[in-house]
From Swiss-Prot:
HAMAP family: 16SrRNA_methyltr_G (MF_00074). Its EC number is 2.1.1.170. It holds the Pfam family GidB. InterPro entries: rRNA_ssu_MeTfrase_G, SAM-dependent_MTases_sf. Gene3D superfamilies: Vaccinia Virus protein VP39. SUPFAM superfamilies: S-adenosyl-L-methionine-dependent methyltransferases (SSF53335). NCBIfam families: rsmG_gidB. This is Ribosomal RNA small subunit methyltransferase G. Specifically methylates the N7 position of guanine in position 527 of 16S rRNA. It comes from the Bacteria. GO terms for cellular component: cytosol. It is found in: Cytoplasm. It catalyses: guanosine(527) in 16S rRNA + S-adenosyl-L-methionine = N(7)-methylguanosine(527) in 16S rRNA + S-adenosyl-L-homocysteine.
Length: 206
């Protein structure tokens, strides 16, 4: 059932995936559903809704990623980082979260599904000092873009980019950005079977 739905949704989004990638995406949903019963990793309980709201919602960002090295801040159970890593084996992703149970889940996913291009780090963002900075800083965890830029300012390279995943856009939010930052793109994301607004904002330092 999930497999047929995944094929349908990927086709609607014009995304191509190998059989191995599809198997990993479905495996991730199945593991999330299983672990969620004990660890409360997401408020979504239905695997079909997980596929839409977590997997496809994450994958909508995939065509817009530029660079090779990314960090997903406040990743929770690995969203959007794990689905993006599965679909982009040529890129590397650091998954950052401060809760140990989420990191344990991510490491189990990495082990069981054989995902080679992710590394999970248990840390608060302000305490995390990477040896190498990132081409892209991703997050759907922050309440505002202003907060994201404040807490993640030390993570991107000089020409790196922030990718803020948002629902409905608040116009005043972009007006509150510090003057040294610029929103280069506001992309409306289309997620199959999700009748809610989704946007990706790309922000750079001037």
């Amino acid at each position: 059932m999930l497999s047929a739905q995944l094929d349908e949704y990927l086709a609607e989004m014009n995304l191509s995936a190998t059989e191995q990638q599809k198997k990993q995406l479905i495996g991730f949903v199945e593991m999330l559903n299983k672990w969620n019963k004990a660890y409360n990793l997401t408020s979504i309980r239905d695997p079909q809704q997980m596929l839409i709201r977590h997997i496809m919602d994450s994958l909508a960002v995939s065509p817009h990623l530029v660079g090779e090295r990314f960090i997903d801040v406040g990743t929770g159970p690995g969203l959007p980082g794990i689905p993006l890593a599965i679909m982009n084996p040529d890129k590397t992703f650091v998954l950052l979260d401060s809760l140990g149970k989420r990191i344990r889940f991510q490491k189990q996913v990495q082990h069981e599904l054989g995902i080679k291009n992710i590394s999970s780090v248990e840390s608060r963002v302000e305490a995390y000092q990477p040896e190498t900075k990132f081409d892209g800083v991703l997050s759907r965890a922050f309440a505002s873009i202003e907060d994201m830029l404040h807490w993640c300012h030390h993570l991107p390279t000089d020409d790196g980019c922030y990718y803020a995943l948002k629902g409905q856009l608040a116009e005043d939010e972009m007006e509150k950005l510090p003057e040294e930052f610029e929103v280069t793109d506001v992309i409306e994301l289309k997620v199959p079977r999700l009748d809610e607004q989704r946007h990706l904002l790309r922000v750079i330092k001037k």
